């Protein structure tokens, strides 16, 4: 998959927050934020789907290890609106990644790869990044 933005050497440590703010396209079908070691080893594939791949208004999360996808997790909370500015905050520890959505709802996704640092981020789809911050 071609990516709209790729960043490496992030060295995001457990407990640190990655905030991503951007604009959702007015005709959005889906967008993706990938976090991990590299494009073949992702501790989080975060994929809000407005209407894509048979899903509507659903967040699909997954992992990828050595190029092989894991089992998808579907999160029913969906606060994203086409044409809006939105922000997602992601923190992690040895056990879980915690994803805080724009409406304040939080959910956990297991750190299946036991990553101790996140060095890679990629974004693609119907989402234009305005700001990336580390806290």
UniProtKB/Swiss-Prot annotation:
Any one Pfam family match given in the protein's UniProt record, by short name: Gal-bind_lectin
One Gene Ontology MF term: receptor ligand activity
Modified residues (N-acetylalanine): 2
Record-listed a beta-D-galactoside binding positions: 45-49, 53, 62, 69-72
Modified-residue entries (N6-acetyllysine), positions: 13, 19, 29, 108, 128
Keyword list, A-Z: Acetylation, Apoptosis, Cytoplasm, Extracellular matrix, Lectin, Phosphoprotein, Secreted
Residue positions where N6-succinyllysine is found in the record: 108
Residues covered by the Galectin domain: 4-135
GO annotation, cellular component aspect: collagen-containing extracellular matrix; cytosol; extracellular region; extracellular space; galectin complex; plasma membrane
Compartment annotation: Secreted, Extracellular space, Extracellular matrix; Cytoplasm; Secreted
Gene Ontology biological process terms in this record: apoptotic process; cell-cell adhesion; heterophilic cell-cell adhesion via plasma membrane cell adhesion molecules; myoblast differentiation; negative regulation of T-helper 17 cell lineage commitment; plasma cell differentiation; positive regulation of apoptotic process; positive regulation of inflammatory response
Residue(s) carrying Phosphoserine: 30
Record's function text: Lectin that binds beta-galactoside and a wide array of complex carbohydrates. Plays a role in regulating apoptosis, cell proliferation and cell differentiation. Inhibits CD45 protein phosphatase activity and therefore the dephosphorylation of Lyn kinase. Strong inducer of T-cell apoptosis. Plays a negative role in Th17 cell differentiation via activation of the receptor CD69.
Subunit structure of this chain's protein: Homodimer. Binds LGALS3BP. Interacts with CD2, CD3, CD4, CD6, CD7, CD43, ALCAM and CD45. Interacts with laminin (via poly-N-acetyllactosamine). Interacts with SUSD2. Interacts with cargo receptor TMED10; the interaction mediates the translocation from the cytoplasm into the ERGIC (endoplasmic reticulum-Golgi intermediate compartment) and thereby secretion. Interacts with CD69.
Protein's recorded name: Galectin-1
Organism: Mus musculus (Mouse)
